[in-house]
Amino acid sequence: MLLLNQTLATTEKQTALQAAEKFVDELCISYSAKKGRGYARKRQKNLLATLQAYKPQNPKDAPVNCDKCGKPGNVKNDCPGSMRKPARPCPICGGDHWRVDCPQRCRSLGPKPVSQVSNRIDGPQGSCPWL
């Protein structure tokens, strides 16, 4: 995973440098018409050197550690160690998971049989009763 991140970071840097070089070339072409070719070439070299030496303060390819468990690869919101188990069983199937994660929840969203149709007016007839 780290190798993939490094490869992506290298590719992104190369793409950014190519785009910057193209921008500098276009800028120098338009500028050379005003000032002369020698000055434009010198300016182009200075801009390219500045762009290649640029290092961001917080690089994206640096490993990120979780604030809760301290392990690299996840962040606090996605930490698998912070997942709480539900206090009660699932009201739909009785399993040990949250209601929103129930595999039996709303298998078919088609119309309900007449015996299950409620007299509620706040939702469509074929909607899931557990939403």
UniProtKB/Swiss-Prot annotation:
**PROSITE patterns, per database record:** ZF_CCHC (PS50158)
Record flagged with keyword Transcription: no
Specify whether Metal-binding is a keyword of the entry: yes
A molecular-function term among this protein's GO annotations:
nucleic acid binding
The record, for InterPro entries, names: Znf_CCHC, Znf_CCHC_sf
Q: What UniProt keywords apply to this chain's record, in alphabetical order?
A: Metal-binding, Zinc, Zinc-finger
Disulphide bonds annotated for this chain are none
Zn-finger (CCHC-type) intervals are 64-81
Q: What is this protein called?
A: Putative uncharacterized protein COL25A1-DT
Q: Which organism is it from?
A: Homo sapiens (Human)
